[in-house]
């Protein structure tokens, strides 16, 4: 995070050594850190082509130790899929009876666009059908929240716009909001999400919603997916306004994370 090690070197270190970690809580944390390093702190051109983390996670997901397998599978579902991980999740959907893992697999495949051999509106329709079927299998409160995330993860412009607008409207309860935000910003959504628009709606969101909902919404919609100097400049301009204290703190925190990502990408490029 502080730029003393290139992100790609950290990813390589975790990919080589994760299999040796025996403490599950530690393993879960370092896998999450490696995924963050690859998606946020590494040079995007390198990250797009590198598969060492995905390969290591896939190997761990195939472990005979059920607890370790779950940790690796959950991490694998949160990064960009490649051919082998795509096939793994397709098989998992066909064979697993674990509802939580099935939702992870389904969401990853939906976001990847590989749930069915269709694209565009047909892909969205296939996702809705698959989610409805899965919800019949897991008709629980947890299953319902997972279904909201999965549907929000459909990576089409129309879907992302609809989910964004629904979130900005401020009529969702906290749990539904969190699930839809997680799906909205799931892997593969970066180029489909607005950036500058956040700074036009943030003050309205803050003034119109309860403190808890407003904080969740502002934090979730801040355009951290657009790691660029332009977005950083927009954030600085926004922070120069006369803002409510809570809104200023929330945006400042996200602005600083964005600045860190910019610095670390520069370090990673060498």
Predicted regions span which residues?
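Long, ordered, helix-rich scaffold segments
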Residues: 1-270
